[in-house]
Amino acid sequence: MTEKTASHYWNEETSILKLRRKDILLFEIYATTLLLGSIYSIYVDKWSITSYFGNSKNLINLIFVKRGWFWTSLVYFYHAWDQKRNKIDFKFISRYIVATLWWMFVTQWFIGPGLIDRTFALSGGSCKNFDGDSSVFIPLTASTCKGLNGSWSGGHDLSGHVFLLTHSSLFMLSENFSFILNNGIKATSTKVLFGLLGLWWWMLFVTASFYHTTFEKCTGFFSGILEWSIVYVFSSRMPAVADLLGSSDY
């Protein structure tokens, strides 16, 4: 299969909701990873975790995953500037801004607390046993609660790790899928991109194996594919979105 034929093959629509082969492939990779991790979690004693990666204080989690969108942005623009700088235009930047806004809305801020914290609170969760007078102030976010030595408990804890790792990976792969098919993994910047994708994949498997309930992982995954589905999968059926954001199929 030649490079052009490969690119054409993966961008062809299938009989499954007229989805392209590459979109089905990307969905299957991350859905399967989540499924395998969840199956593995059945055999893991979460109360006596000895695995290095099973400890949330491992350096990879603290240095990379906790700052996941920073590393995603850094590697994304490094690769784009090195390999596709002539393609960096308004629509290219617009797609990044949309992806960043979705990350921000889910994890950081959405007219107040982010959607993760809002979901937790709306499902009955709250900060308990924190340092302060509960009649004067009630922490509304997990980070504020933790900062006051409280316990953020009682609600639906949508998996932020599953969201971030899925969202970041699908964003980088969708932006570079055709480019990689046509150019391979020769350049240093492309190898760095694949290195980060590999790390994100591994940490997604770790998260699915050691943390959260099945439903919490599923809602995190749904949040992770939502923006991707609109911008990259179904945008061709939404003229307004397609006109504003263009296509990543370089």
UniProtKB/Swiss-Prot annotation:
The active site is at H161, H212. It is a multi-pass membrane protein. It catalyses: an acyl-CoA + H2O = an acyl-4'-phosphopantetheine + adenosine 3',5'-bisphosphate + 2 H(+); (9Z)-octadecenoyl-CoA + H2O = S-(9Z-octadecenoyl)-4'-phosphopantetheine + adenosine 3',5'-bisphosphate + 2 H(+); (5Z,8Z,11Z,14Z)-eicosatetraenoyl-CoA + H2O = S-(5Z,8Z,11Z,14Z-eicosatetraenoyl)-4'-phosphopantetheine + adenosine 3',5'-bisphosphate + 2 H(+); hexadecanoyl-CoA + H2O = S-hexadecanoyl-4'-phosphopantetheine + adenosine 3',5'-bisphosphate + 2 H(+). InterPro entries: FIT, SCS3. The keyword rRNA-binding does not apply. Its EC number is 3.6.1.-. Residues 1-23, 80-95, 182-191, 235-250 are cytoplasmic. Pfam families: FIT. Residues 45-58, 117-160, 213 are lumenal. Keywords: Endoplasmic reticulum, Glycoprotein, Hydrolase, Lipid biosynthesis, Lipid metabolism, Membrane, Phospholipid biosynthesis, Phospholipid metabolism, Transmembrane, Transmembrane helix. Glycans are attached at N149. GO terms for molecular function: coenzyme A diphosphatase activity; hydrolase activity, acting on acid anhydrides, in phosphorus-containing anhydrides. The chain crosses the membrane at residues 24-44, 59-79, 96-116, 161-181, 192-212, 214-234. The keyword Lyase does not apply. It is found in: Endoplasmic reticulum membrane. One of its GO terms (biological process) is lipid droplet organization. One of its GO terms (cellular component) is endoplasmic reticulum. PANTHER family: ACYL-COENZYME A DIPHOSPHATASE FITM2 (PTHR23129:SF0). Belongs to the FIT family. Fungal FIT2B/SCS3 subfamily. Fatty acyl-coenzyme A (CoA) diphosphatase that hydrolyzes fatty acyl-CoA to yield acyl-4'-phosphopantetheine and adenosine 3',5'-bisphosphate. Preferentially hydrolyzes unsaturated long-chain acyl-CoA substrates in the endoplasmic reticulum (ER) lumen. This catalytic activity is required for maintaining ER structure and for lipid droplets (LDs) biogenesis, which are lipid storage organelles involved in maintaining lipid and energy homeostasis. May directly bind to diacylglycerol (DAGs) and triacylglycerol, which is also important for LD biogenesis. This is Acyl-coenzyme A diphosphatase fit1. It comes from Schizosaccharomyces pombe (strain 972 / ATCC 24843) (Fission yeast).
